[in-house]
A protein has these predicted regions:
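Conserved glycine-rich Rossmann-like NAD(P)H-binding loop of the short-chain dehydrogenase/reductase
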Residues: 1-24
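The beta1-alpha1 cofactor-binding region of Rossmann-like NAD(H)/NADP(H)-dependent oxidoreductases
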Residues: 19-23, 40-52, 83
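A glycine-rich helix->loop->beta "capping" turn
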Residues: 32-37, 55-68, 74, 160
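Hydrophobic positions on the long internal alpha-helix
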Residues: 52, 67, 100-104, 108, ...
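Substrate-binding pocket helix/loop in short-chain dehydrogenase/reductase
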Residues: 77-78, 82-87
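Catalytic loop of short-chain dehydrogenase/reductase
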Residues: 109-157, 165-170, 176, 180-181
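C-terminal helical subdomain
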Residues: 163-164, 181-258
Length: 258
């Protein structure tokens, strides 16, 4: 399948702690057989987002899928959270998700199988997910509330709106920098599990599969995957649970044992 992707990022400058740039990501997509359009975009700017959406439509002829993955994170308590960090998390996570979805909507209506996918957690209202990280949890749950509301609002348009969240930590630079370095990476699954789960969701019938808060390994398990060792940084090793995964989430033996 040839993928045509618009990549949005605030800057083209390399980050001191995060590898690559929007342009190196585009090169990887092209090398894998896809087509990429890198666009510098501050997701907090209405003009920037509108322009990025218009560029995607002009370049590719339309929009079939909107993935809201942009997030800011700071895992601090109320006392230690500066208001500028609170504002940043809410501007990017909640407002950014809402705005990108809103501006993609007219174009998604024209697609044969339109999907919005937010990288956002289930709306599990347990106090343990809020205490100590109130600002961040509120910001991420705003993305989740977009799923809840937009799925219902867009249902008659045939536009699917779903959320995807990992059961465990994922081995990304952000996790390495914010959650504990190399040791956490050993307790994480690779990014491929989220990519594969996203593919399963985005290839479903948008009129039939919407309003779901999906967990990565459950999506893959239900699609037929029974061996998850290929996704582990250390096969059969201990995995660190991610935030926000409800205690009631099923854990089949095939997932538990690999």
């Amino acid at each position: 399948m040839v993928q045509r992707l618009l990549l949005q990022q605030k800057t083209a400058d390399p980050h001191p702690k995060l590898p690559g740039t929007i342009y190196t990501a585009a090169e990887e997509i092209v090398e894998a057989g896809g087509e990429a359009l890198p666009v510098i975009c501050d997701i907090r700017s209405e003009d920037n987002v509108r322009d990025a959406v218009n560029q995607a439509v002009d370049h590719f002829g339309g929009i079939d899928i909107c993935i809201n993955n942009a997030s800011a994170i700071q895992l601090t308590n109320v006392t230690d959270t500066e208001m500028k960090r609170y504002d940043l998390m809410h501007q990017i996570n909640g407002r950014g998700t809402y705005m990108v979805s809103k501006f993609c909507l007219p174009h998604l209506k024209k697609s044969d199988n339109p999907h919005i996918l937010n990288l956002a957690p289930p709306l599990d209202m347990e106090a343990k997910w809020f205490a100590g990280t109130v600002a961040y949890t509120m910001a991420k749950y705003t993305m989740s509330m977009c799923v809840l509301g937009m799925a219902e609002e867009f249902k008659d348009m045939g536009i699917a709106v779903n959320a995807l969240w990992p059961r465990t930590a994922i081995a990304t630079a952000a996790v390495q920098n914010h959650l504990g370095g190399d040791e956490i990476m050993k307790l994480s699954r690779t990014v491929e599990i989220m990519a594969d789960a996203s593919y399963e969701i985005l290839t479903k019938d948008s009129k039939e599969f919407t309003g779901n808060f999906c967990i990565d390994d459950i999506v893959l398990y239900e699609s037929g995957v029974k061996d998850f060792t290929k996704y582990a940084s250390v096969p059969f090793g201990e995995l660190m649970p991610d935030f926000f995964v409800p205690d009631s989430t099923p854990l089949p033996d095939e997932i538990k044992n690999s």
